[in-house]
Amino acid sequence: MAVAALICLVAVALGAPQAASQATPQTSEQVFKNVQVLKGIPVDDFMGTMGIMCAALGFDCSECHAGAGTDKVDWAADTPKKLMARKMVRMVTAINHDNFSGRQMVTCWSCHHGRDRPATTPALENVYGPGSQEMDDVLTQMPGQPSADKIVDKYLQTIGGTERLAGLKSFTAKGTSVGFGGFGGGGKVQIFAKFPDQRATVIDFPDSPERGDSLRIFNGHEAWMETPLTILGEYQLTGGELDGARLDAQLSFPGQIRQVLTNLRVSMPVTISDLPGPSSQTSNQSSMVAVGQDRIVDVVQGTTPRGTLATLYFDKESGLLVRMVRYGKSPIGRVPTQIDYADYREVNGIKMPFRMLFAWLGGRDAIQLSEVQTNVPIDAARFGRPAPSKGH
């Protein structure tokens, strides 16, 4: 599922990949061919929309695009399922417009839940079984819960205290990464972060240097993403994912959490389980991401100045941040991105996560760090637009 969704997201480009370099960001119909409905939106929002469709219906690219997965693919060709998808987008838009004043109350996921055709009859095991564990995207302050300040203060104190955190101005990290199954194994990861809002994650694949690197970069104003083995390759983030990249960079320095997220509210505590790692993990890599560990967490949600929702999950016992889910935008619903944090270790008086699982609708990257250095000089070029990939 993850492999299919990722391919669906990143391989539908038929226009020129160099569009990202334009001063004025190009829209979906300028980069992709035969776009009939999802016009006028940034490329990253368009790709997020493809991810929602894949996840909601359990599809991969080949379900809608003729020849996907082969060298004879015709991305622009109209197929019955692509035509139906356009009808569904129009239908969902009309439902929300006519009944909810345009708010996105109904999405593909509302009905499909991973099925091609929505279920129409309730299963008794669901009627009389445990209730749904799915949380609302937008949370409200629940009475009787500790204040957001108390939860955040406990977290900051646990990882080193505000004074030490205020002194954290940069860090670099090295380790290994395992991606989604179709990527053919793991790579070496480097992370560069500079206060207050610059971050670059670089994953290279020494066993397959021809494929190029996987990159996520935010320089404080602009962001780029590059995924190997795709037609689109490197592209600039200008839609909802731009704010997501900014938030990831800012939260690399936890001392500014209350400046980054405002209107903090606390929901009910919940029990969460670790997200399984990528299917490509081998037995000797499986320890990189714990699976099946349950923990009770305090749930705090805030909003960025640009309106992006972010939900933070703090371990109720230790106070550590163990998960962050942020929501991008698309014409047919919010696009979730989840980062799980574990294996906190002390580095110069500050506890930092050495294990991270970065998951989006198109795949998962499991990262295990082996080395972190704080307050080291970082070349500004690390946060610049990436050079053309070796694979393109």
Region roles according to the model:
Residues 2-13:
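Bacterial N-terminal signal peptides
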Residues 129-188, 388-392:
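N-terminal cleavable signal peptides for secretion/export
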Residues 58-68, 105-115:
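The canonical Cys-X-X-Cys-His
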Residues 224-256:
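Acidic/charged, solvent-exposed loop-and-adjacent secondary-structure segments enriched in E/D, K/R, S/T
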